[in-house]
Curated annotation (Swiss-Prot):
Residues 1-22 are annotated as: Disordered. The gene is proA. Catalyzes the NADPH-dependent reduction of L-glutamate 5-phosphate into L-glutamate 5-semialdehyde and phosphate. The product spontaneously undergoes cyclization to form 1-pyrroline-5-carboxylate. The lineage of its organism: Bacteria, Pseudomonadati, Thermodesulfobacteriota, Syntrophia, Syntrophales. It catalyses: L-glutamate 5-semialdehyde + phosphate + NADP(+) = L-glutamyl 5-phosphate + NADPH + H(+). It comes from Syntrophus aciditrophicus (strain SB). This is Gamma-glutamyl phosphate reductase. SUPFAM superfamilies: ALDH-like.
Amino acid sequence: MAIQDEMRQVAEGAREASRTLSRMPTEIKDRALKEMAERLLQQAGWLMQENEKDVAFAKNLGLSPAMIDRLTLKESTIRDMADGILEVASLPDPVGKVTSMWRRPNGLLVGRMRIPLGVIGIIYESRPNVTADAAALCLKSGNAVILRGGSEAIHSNIAIGRLLKDVLKETSLPEAAIQVVETTDREAVYELLQLEEYIDLIIPRGGEDLIRAVVRQSRIPVIKHYKGVCHVFVDADADLEMAAKICLNAKIQRPGVCNAMETLLVHREAAPRFLPELARKLRESHVVIRGCEETCALISDAEQATEADWYREYLDLVLSIRVVGGIEEAMDHIARYGSLHTESIVTNDYANAQRFLNEVNSSTVLVNASTRFSDGFQLGLGAEIGISTTKLHAYGPMGLEELTTTKFIVYGNGQVRT
């Protein structure tokens, strides 16, 4: 079958499944989700065997350590996937929820009710866990999903997808509610992006090149999950011990993820007391520092940062550091170089904390906490579909409610328009 026909068949199946799924009772969806979580744990050994094929191929291709880290499935990763699905099952079902009601002067009772978006296409790279997370969120929110992962994770994605579909076959849920595109042919992505009559939304997750290509080619609305140039600003009166703990966690715990800190901004008054000791701790973890002139004067082995470095999402053990004159300069830097993802301020100044929260326009803004908390699971949303940097429809970590929209419902007793 030609790729064009195959993708149309997939999309037609998803559209039909979405109609059935949208009216499924919460109990049936939750029962299926719990069984999916159990199935992942039961088949963890097989999943890791399939994943090893992808990891070996990725190493032969010379993919970066950050890419390989995101690609690798371990027992702990699979357990986290299962926990994420169980968390989704435990959350309230947004479908059918009436968010507000009001009465008009003519007696009409008007309200808003949450409904699924319909069919969602997700295009992603190197992250097999997205297959499980996205499938769970879409199922619970009543959406059919078409999942197209990167060629580097094809064995892992197919394996996870088949386990999830096996559960659907054992329930009254439509089998086409979850579909993994099993071809690595790039033409499949292009063909999916043309099917606006079947697919309601496209969510790309991956590198800049992928996201730009999807936005350029798609005839379907796109919510971008763009790069994470995340900042931490250490204020003049910050608790420096706490600041060091936050910075080390934000940079070192998992440098290859989008909510890792990429640029550190330090108030000029705190820099001499803070940066030399922080640099020593960063050095122990093999972090390369690229700094402004003032940073290089305080850290002897720091490399001179270029203009391009301030825009860069390293996804690696590399950190840009700039010394700034205060909160105004820090916020100006974030506004110029940031990617609207996640920013944190470390401060004991309440006014500065509130100003940072109010004026920094990124999708997640934190006070005295690591950027690593910009995550659906950590914020109580359950597994997330991703972190949107598109302000229209959804902004920040996307959980269940962000995968629904609202329709107007109106109760009357014979009113007619005059």
